[in-house]
């Protein structure tokens, strides 16, 4: 079916963004970044420009790991949460104090600088175009969107961005995301700096302050993703690799160590 190249994403509009990079002469890293950016638009219920990122990459000679999980704002401390939320000593489940510094864009930049081939701004083009022109919302995305709307609609800014008609989009309805398109263009033009030191960073910090949150421009500007050595485990003739903690991959390796003690083939399917 495939000669040499393939791109797979959970949403059918994500893969063409990656393929476009391959057709333009880009490599697998270019394709992965473009597809990831597109997924923040077409599956906003599962992805976002404010999300984290982890990556394990084989360059043909060496295995690399990248941890771009969000760091806590410097203002977070047990005392901070005691003062704002009574006896609570950890972040709340929702609201401005439930968010950490976004890591995904920094991961895209770091991967591109080390392994990418095409210009960084080209990698953001497909996602920005989809956000501007819109896309038809598929059933699975719509179901998650509608399920989360009742709990999230009271969050500041959520209704304006994700419930433009006062409700979640219907299946097959065209959804446009102009604010995300503008953000992607700013990220593209500044090689990601807009999110950490530029206009988007200032807007994020101002919004957090307005809502009484702890996130500051200093938190955003000081953020850096971390290159790490993947951890691994041999299992029945295979070697599996994961990002070390704070990633959760170590749990999978521990589980494999437990499973290795059992003769799974002798057990019933259920």
Residue ranges and their predicted role:
Residues 1-20, 28-197, 201-247, 264-267:
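Noncatalytic scaffold domains of N-terminal-nucleophile
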Residues 250:
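Flexible, polar/acidic helix-loop-strand segments at domain edges
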Residues 258-270:
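Structured C-terminal helix/loop/strand segments within mature extracytoplasmic catalytic/sensor domains
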């Amino acid at each position: 079916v495939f000669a040499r190249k393939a791109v797979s994403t959970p949403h059918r509009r994500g893969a063409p963004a990656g393929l476009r990079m391959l057709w333009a002469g880009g490599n697998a890293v270019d394709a992965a970044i473009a597809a990831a950016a597109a997924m923040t638009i077409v599956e906003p219920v599962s992805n976002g420009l404010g999300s984290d990122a982890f990556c394990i990459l084989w360059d043909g000679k060496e295995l690399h790991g990248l941890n771009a999980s969000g760091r806590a704002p410097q203002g977070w401390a047990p005392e901070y949460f005691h003062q704002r939320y009574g006896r609570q000593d950890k972040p709340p489940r929702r609201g401005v104090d439930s968010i950490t510094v976004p890591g995904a864009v920094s991961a895209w930049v770091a991967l591109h600088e080390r392994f990418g081939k095409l210009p960084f701004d080209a990698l953001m083009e497909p996602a920005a175009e989809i956000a501007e022109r819109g896309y038809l919302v598929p059933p699975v995305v719509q179901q998650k969107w509608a399920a989360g709307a009742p709990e999230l609609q009271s969050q500041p800014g959520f209704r304006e961005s994700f419930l433009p008609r006062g409700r979640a989009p219907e299946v097959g309805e065209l959804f446009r995301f102009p604010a995300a398109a503008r953000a992607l263009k700013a990220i593209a033009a500044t090689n990601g700096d807009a999110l950490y030191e530029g206009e988007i960073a200032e807007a994020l910090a101002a919004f957090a302050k307005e809502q009484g949150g702890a996130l500051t421009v200093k938190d955003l500007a000081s953020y850096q993703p971390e290159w790490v050595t993947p951890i691994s485990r041999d299992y029945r003739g295979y070697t599996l690799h994961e990002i070390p903690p704070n990633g959760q991959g170590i749990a999978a390796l521990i589980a494999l160590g437990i499973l290795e003690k059992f003769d799974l083939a002798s057990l019933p399917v259920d």
